[in-house]
A protein has these predicted regions:
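An extended, acidic
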Residues: 1-116
Length: 116
């Protein structure tokens, strides 16, 4: 669940934010405003534009399990440095996650200069 994922990342990051739209959160990753983003239970139109922005900016995309992102369902996006750490941190949780649970969050690391 979101709270379990949040408990895993909070001790390791400067903050977690949620803009409210997957496309905007992904655009923030692409622009470098946030370092990472995850969400469960998305539809293809939620992420099509944002996923392209992340890819073109040199970011990494996958499912939260680390598999190839398929434009819907779960997504994990981030800078190359953060992405693999997010997938590894979430691995024990997503393996036990019930189907259909929705969760979201964006990550800011301690080095993030964006305003709170």
């Amino acid at each position: 669940t979101y709270m379990q994922m949040l408990r895993v990342v909070m001790p390791q990051v400067a903050g977690v934010r949620r803009a409210g739209a997957a496309a905007l959160d992904l655009a923030y990753v692409a622009a470098g405003r946030v370092d990472g983003y995850w969400e469960l239970g998305l539809l293809p139109w939620d992420t099509a534009a944002g996923a392209l922005l992340v890819t073109e900016a040199g970011g990494h995309l996958s499912t939260v399990h680390g598999g190839e992102y398929q434009h819907g369902g779960d997504i994990c996006a981030g800078t190359p440095r953060i992405h693999s750490a997010m997938v590894a941190a979430f691995a024990p949780l997503v393996a036990a996650r019930p189907v259909g649970v929705k969760s979201a969050g964006t990550l800011r690391t301690a080095g993030d200069k964006a305003n709170a």
